[in-house]
Amino acid sequence: MPLAVFAAPTFSALIAVVILSYMTVGICMWYSMSWQQVLRDLSVLQCGINFLPFGIGSVAAVALSAYLLPRVAAQWIMAVGVVCVLAASLLLATQPVQQTYWQQTFPAIVFLGFCPDFVYLAAQIIASNSVSRKHQGVASSLIGTLNLYGNALGLGVAATIETEIVKGSTEDGSSQGENSVSGYRAALYFGAGIAAVSLLLDFAFVRMPKNDREGWEEEIEDVEQEPDVLVASAIQRPSAA
């Protein structure tokens, strides 16, 4: 990984926005399913059906972001994605333990479906415009990798928060059900908090660099050009007798 890519304008801030937003996505996906299975005692099949709006929202987000990218600055499209996951985490964190699916869980899952594609597509455009051509592949790969790392990192931190909250509630004499609810809410509020930080970073530091480059006229300075070596081969033919 060349360190030069992190010196590009807005690139470091872009990395922070992407990883924080994907941390929240992972937290919301895990705890929305856990809430339905553990606290509401729904079957795995019912939980899978309840999560179908996520896929529908993701498909709609791809089409909508493709329409918006030529018309709206990429950082604002990314901001819309972060707002969606922020709204999803707040809806999930504030829902009662027993509530109809359509009241808060359904809109939260729909909002959640819009975040990954809005953030990912906008981040790819910004990353490609922020670095030189020789680093565009590396920058794009890094954005894709942050999806997985963000999900894993977010779940790791959220699970630690949940465990500590449950441990503290148990020492206070609370019931097991109350402990689980408190831990889930704390993890989801943590996700909302880092999504809010991601949104602030996007507004403050992430910008779409202007790209005036045409064709492949940009010279790559650090690539050594080897001189052409001409090898002449002499072909001797036997003389006629």
Task: Show which residues each predicted segment covers.
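Intrinsically disordered, low-complexity terminal tails of fungal membrane proteins
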Residues: 208-241
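Interhelical loop segments of eukaryotic multi-pass membrane proteins
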Residues: 1-5, 170-176, 213-219
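12-transmembrane solute porter fold
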Residues: 1-169, 180-205, 209
